[in-house]
Regions:
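Low-complexity, acidic/Ser/Thr- and charged residue-rich accessory regions of DNA metabolism proteins
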Residues: 140-149, 205-206, 244-271, 275, ...
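Short beta-alpha connecting loops at secondary-structure transitions
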Residues: 17, 338-345, 368, 408-421, ...
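Long, charge-rich intrinsically disordered scaffolds of nucleic-acid metabolism proteins
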Residues: 95, 396, 402, 407-477, ...
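A glycine-rich phosphate-binding loop feature that marks nucleotide/adenosyl-phosphate handling sites
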Residues: 176-183, 316-320, 374-379, 398-405, ...
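Accessory alpha-helical DNA-binding modules that contact the DNA backbone or grooves
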Residues: 29-30, 45-147, 337, 476-615, ...
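Duplex nucleic acid-engaging cores and interfaces of nucleic-acid transaction enzymes
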Residues: 45-51, 58, 62-315, 319-419, ...
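Short, ordered loop/turn segments at secondary-structure junctions
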Residues: 36-38, 127, 236, 318, ...
Length: 704
């Protein structure tokens, strides 16, 4: 039944879901399933496999909750056959909780106290609505604990209010009305005007619950978390009350007055607060999912940024008072030299700094400069551009986001125990240019600076989603097993931290891996981990050329057949494009291997050893713009997209503050999502449309 529910929810065929769920339950990873098990899934991509896994996890949690509910009600002796059937056929978490509510163990309530005083029968009389002499009948319930008939009726109404609050239809009425017509309303907490000035837009703001944007809702929630705002849901209480009265009060009711009071009390004290909490939690989950989705996509783009490749780099972490930290890295990213120069105020040793950089560039045959884009970045760029170096030496501005986090991390201390954080930070900047993916995996994704309200969303869900993105990117690119750090190996399908460390330790003790099969000699790396990981690990220059491809070892025999059929060797087949063009994939389809896998094999042979990431392009900011004071409305400037949100994109134009291109200014057409128009790292041309110097805000447009 689980697979059928998933298929219905996702609009994916049942056989595809069944095949995917079976593999997931066997311990297969999302990258492995989507890359190497296309016959089992009907060629589902990573996003679809991930969606199935998410639904499977949710339904597994629901099943566990269902068993708890059944056990609790059965323990009370109240589990009828009909009730069991309803619970077992329920696949909605909210509905399950509504069914369970009347049986759920409760803390002491007003209704509990009334029952303990023997007022349940009186509640039945009031709800029967036939007693025209209720006060006289209530007299029978006056005791030492119940002083008057009026007190007895009040207690009975407390019981009725609780019964109404536990009625599924009543809760659905309130839920439906508040959900469809309610508005999220934020109000300022009295006396917090000055402290909460940044939330001034939300001091008295309302947005329809059904359509409130994720960034607006999360801003309200953050204001509430900081004690500045109070959030509630406005709804038509009168209409809801009328609907509840129609359900619980009969025409000609003899106890209408008391029933109306019980309905009003139930709505105000019990149902509405409960449903409001539920709806706000659902809105928070929806907003979280949207914000996490934006963050995840930004992270994916950043991790897959174009690498410079294996080139010798001089990396500079710029600064004024403390100087610029300079490191020289070889083509593998190893640190070979470091120093500090002081070209900027207050020291101003410009000529000395320039000569130092010229000497380093010549001595180490530098092929590129990587300059951090933070404080003093543009000034340092000017310095390097004025060195008069060979035109073949390229210059790149590199984001510093996360570099300081890495430099102070355990990973950095382990790698560079004898260097301080400033040297480590410069190394990270240089390596981020050489290979962004290999460097960024060492940093907590939340520190990379491409999120939207990342500190306001569910942190567990955020971490899981970002880890999935990192895993996806690492496996998409693949890693060289003989040069990969334990940090990047951790994200390879089927490995994890322990096996990654074991691989690095084995490599240190035994030298480079000669082939993929040698992985099976790594301690604790068994057949299952090998199956999941092997296709994503590359052995460059080993004794089997297929080990430097995306072809899985389980399919090597197919390539060998292709070579034999062509009357050649595997080496020749890999080297000769014309031989590969003559391959007819359908000839190699059998009961074990389908056309999707064979097609992937042929494609992998064509792309063997190629990096799927784009080529890196050089870029220069406008040389006349260094501060917000240099900007004028109407200026057209080159820029780089640094962050994408639901409401637009932030663009670095070469000054301290990034400018915002609002979604309405991204194109001369309607844009539903900024991702339709831009991606991280994209070079764009923008026009300055607004400058708020006091608040450091810059408005930009990409419209023609």
């Amino acid at each position: 039944m689980t697979e059928r529910i998933i298929a219905q929810r996702l609009g994916i065929s049942l056989p595809q879901v069944q095949g995917t769920v079976r593999l997931l339950r066997e311990g297969a990873t999302i990258p492995f399933i989507s890359r190497y098990r296309k016959e089992a899934t009907g060629s589902l991509d990573e996003l679809q496999v991930g969606a199935i896994k998410e639904q499977l996890d949710r339904l597994t949690e629901l099943e566990a909750r269902r068993q708890t509910v059944l056990a609790t009600i059965e323990g009370q002796g109240k589990l009828t056959g009909e009730l069991r059937k309803r619970i077992e056929e329920c696949w909605d978490a909210v509905e399950l909780e509504d069914i369970y509510l009347p049986y759920k163990p409760k803390r002491r309530t007003r209704a509990t106290a009334a029952r303990e005083r023997g007022l349940e029968p009186l509640a039945d009389i009031v709800m029967a609505q036939r007693a025209h002499d209720l006060l006289r009948q209530a007299q029978r319930f006056v005791t030492a604990e119940v002083a008057t008939p009026e007190e007895a009726i009040a207690g009975a109404c407390d019981i009725i209010a609780e019964r109404i609050s536990e009625d599924e239809q009543a809760r659905n009425t309130v839920r439906r009305t508040m959900g469809r017509e309610g508005a999220v309303h934020s109000k300022l907490v009295k006396g917090k005007e000055a402290e909460g000035a940044k939330y001034s837009d939300y001091f008295d703001a309302a947005s329809p619950l059904r359509s409130i944007s994720s960034h607006r809702f999360l801003a309200m929630r953050r204001g509430e978390d900081e004690g500045i705002l109070r959030i509630s849901i406005d709804a038509d209480t009168e209409r809801i009350t009328e609907a509840l009265c129609r359900r619980f009060i009969r025409p000609g009711s003899a106890t209408r007055t008391y029933m109306e009071a019980a309905v009003a009390d139930s709505l105000k004290r019990l149902i509405r607060p409960s449903i409001e909490t539920e709806l706000l939690a659902a809105a928070k989950e929806k907003a979280d999912d949207e914000a996490i989705g934006v963050f995840a996509e930004n992270l994916r783009q950043l991790l897959l940024s174009a690498p410079l490749g294996q080139k010798r780099v001089i990396a500079i972490d710029p600064g004024f008072r403390t100087g610029c930290k300079v490191v020289v890295l070889d083509s593998q990213g190893n640190l070979v030299h470091n120093t500090t120069i002081y070209p900027h105020p207050p020291q101003g040793r410009y000529a000395e700094a320039a000569e130092t950089l010229r000497a380093l560039a010549g001595k180490y045959r530098a092929e590129a400069f990587a300059i951090g884009d933070g404080t003093a970045g543009r000034e340092t760029e000017q310095l390097v551009r004025g060195l008069g170096l060979d035109g073949a030496v390229e210059l790149f501005m590199v984001s510093e986001d996360g570099a300081s986090v890495y430099s102070a991390s355990a990973a950095a201390r382990e790698e560079f125990p004898d260097y301080d954080v400033t040297v480590r930070g410069s190394v990270s900047i240089g390596r981020r240019l050489i290979d962004p993916l290999s460097e960024l995996v060492k940093i907590d994704p939340k520190s990379i600076g491409v999120g939207q309200y990342q500190h306001s969303v569910d942190q567990g869900k955020l971490k899981a989603r970002l880890n999935t993105v990192v895993e996806s990117c690492v496996n998409r690119v693949g890693v060289n097993i003989n040069t990969a750090s334990k940090h990047i190996l951790t994200y390879i399908s089927g490995l994890g931290p322990a096996l990654a460390e074991n691989i690095v330790a084995y490599r240190a003790a035994n030298g480079d891996f000669k082939n993929r099969k040698e992985l099976l000699r790594v301690p604790r790396l068994g057949a299952k981990a090998y199956e999941q990981a092997a296709g994503f690990l590359r052995v460059v220059g080993g004794n089997n050329p297929l080990d430097n491809s995306a072809v899985h070892p389980e399919s090597y025999h197919i390539v060998e057949r292709m070579a034999a059929d062509a009357g050649t060797t595997v080496d020749r087949l890999l080297a000769d494009k014309e031989l590969r063009k003559a391959i007819k994939p359908e000839r190699y389809v059998d009961g074990q291997v389908g056309l999707p896998t064979v097609t992937d094999i042929v494609e992998a042979l064509d792309k063997r050893g190629l990096d799927p990431r784009e080529q890196l392009q050089a870029f220069s900011f406008d040389p006349g713009v260094h501060t917000i004071g240099d900007l004028r409305e109407g200026m057209t400037l080159p820029g780089i997209v640094t962050n994408i949100t639901a409401f637009g994109a932030f663009v670095d134009i070469g000054i301290k503050q990034d400018g915002l291109v609002h979604i309405s200014q991204m194109a001369d057409r309607y844009v539903a999502s900024p991702a339709e128009v831009v991606h991280l790292g994209q070079q764009v041309e923008v026009r300055v449309t607004g400058i708020d110097t006091a608040r450091g805000r810059i408005s930009l447009s990409m419209r023609k």
